[in-house]
């Protein structure tokens, strides 16, 4: 009887050890600061856009849209030193284009299982504020919960990860009020609801930008 009891304990212990360090996508969490819902992060393929700490709220006010992640394993314990390169951002409709490694976490998880996304990303194209969310991917699978409401746009309007003549034409059309090919959001780089000189100032330095 004792032998059978000890064997049962051993089996349970081994099972628990086997799941230790394996992310549980339901228990794990991703969140943004209060007041950052719908914030825009201006991005470029060469990662010279804005940090998440300098995102724009609808209307143009600067807000902190840092994405905080807590990674929990299937035993309910925080995962320490989960590799930052295995944590990255995608968007729910796939609109965000990004370079290899261009949306990875700031660092590997700490002893509390936490890390952040705050650095400028290397990416392009634009998302759909009406229906798209940002997903935190863990080794290729998204954390449950539907994602966080962070949006992106870029001088790389076409999303081919190079800011070139195509993007200049697209931006010029939008500047002139022609939104046939792209919506206003695609060229409203400070999210103030209009395309004007402030957007030209952001677009122009990005010309020629490409993945690192």
Positions of predicted regions on the chain:
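Intrinsically disordered, low-complexity regulatory segments enriched
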Residues: 6-9, 93
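Cellulosome-associated attachment modules in secreted, modular CAZymes
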Residues: 20-212
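Positively charged n-region of N-terminal signal peptides that target proteins for export
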Residues: 1-4
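Bacterial N-terminal signal peptides
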Residues: 8-17
